[in-house]
Amino acid sequence: CIMKMKSKTKSCCQYTQWVVLALLTLIFASCKDNDDATGDFDPNKPVVISEFSPKEGGLGTRMLLYGENFGSDISKIKVTIGGQDSKVVGAKGKSLYCVVPAKAYDGDIKLSILNDEGEEIANTEANEKFVYQKKMLVTTFLGTMYDGNTKYDLKDGPFDDCGGFGGAVWLSFDPKNHNHLYLVGEQHPTRLIDFEKEYVSTVYSGLSKVRTICWTHEADSMIITNDQNNNDRPNNYILTRESGFKVITELTKGQNCNGAETHPINGELYFNSWNAGQVFRYDFTTQETTPLFTIQDSGWEFHIQFHPSGNYAYIVVVNQHYILRSDYDWKTKRLTTPYIVCGQQGAKDWVDGVGKKARMHAPRQGTFVKNPAYKGSSDEYDFYFCDRENHCIRILTPQGRVTTFAGRGSNGTSGYNDGDLRQEARFNHPEGIVYDEERECFFIGDRENHRIRKIGYEE
């Protein structure tokens, strides 16, 4: 399962990988010092791979080959692992430093020596196979930009020609059709990503600032929030499945709503007014709206996300950089006064830690993902969320521990890079995230890269 990667294991693996790399570099440097007399390729001698290290790994693993007569001109050395071309970093006679490529599933290691015309003049193969392990990567799923990653076209089209994405602040699968993924574009149109047709289309546009999508209890209608400043205008609209989610009807009124969510079991709607820090409850049966409580900060954006069990909801306070928990009272069918589970009011930073010691900078949408390691526990879900201004994806455990899952690759911050979750991948203001249980991967709305990114095991 995708979530077997626990935070401690990840940290340990990353540390070990860098230690191995450092050792390989030292060993290779030593080999270079000792191989001066045998550095050049000798066509009268055989090429031999006698050993390699490490014996197992995945994409990006640094590998050393040991043997005889490799030569030292890397432009004339070709290495394949599992039939895939490997990048040769350096060579000196009896040692060679290369990088494991993607999809090297078969694990056979072959080395060829080429002449000036690129023709093979000698070759060899290791007696033992490398054990290739699939790894979790960040990739680009949809979206293109041009002019040095500064411009994009907003258009409908097939997956390979759908332009870029404006906004990308919220993602939600249709509960009745898992091939339909909806993307909220805030001031940009809401889009439908159709996996079956492999096509991106516009669902609706024209509202001032759409922030979130949720669904009625039976999933017969979609509910969208519209963040506007008039208390007498609608703040939540309902779009029926029967209309193809094209007809917009007023549901509730109020200003400054940027978050709404239905209870996963009982179905009532909870929404906010961030201007006053208020949380409201809407009853579909009585059509009554009831104010419940205010959070400790007024005038700051926040949104509400329910745990799948319905036992509690997280209230993510974006601009004040913390996450609250509001427990659900099953007798009164209401959310109760919330309390902080991670972060601290007004304290923006990037720090992994527990509870109020953790630091975030504008947390945004999250998604609950079942963790097999928690089986039998009272809470079996981690909460993966976008940390927008830190340009990364974080994990919040049921115990309140926050760790960094992906992004900020190569000790950087923002950018556009695919690859290893922490060593290479970079985002630019990620805001929307959803976990796809069927495909066992995450999709991320990478706002300023105007793309949909994907996190999953390489295919």
Segments and roles (model prediction):
Residues 26-30:
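C-terminal motif of bacterial Sec signal peptides marking the signal peptidase cleavage site
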Residues 173-178, 215-219, 262-266, 307-310, ...:
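Residue-level detector of Asp-centered blade-edge/turn motifs that repeat once per structural unit
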Residues 65, 134-167, 197-211, 227-230, ...:
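Gly/Pro-rich loop segments of beta-rich domains
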Residues 180-183, 221-225, 268-272, 312-316, ...:
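Conserved beta-propeller blade signature
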Residues 114, 176, 184-187, 225-229, ...:
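Short loop/turn segments immediately following the C-termini of beta-strands
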Residues 32-140, 156, 180-182, 333:
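Ser/Thr/Pro-rich low-complexity tracts
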Residues 238-239, 282-286, 325-334, 399-400, ...:
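Short loop/turn segments immediately following beta-strands, especially the blade-tip
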Residues 428-459:
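Blade-level signature of beta-propeller repeat domains, shared across WD40, Kelch, NHL, RCC1
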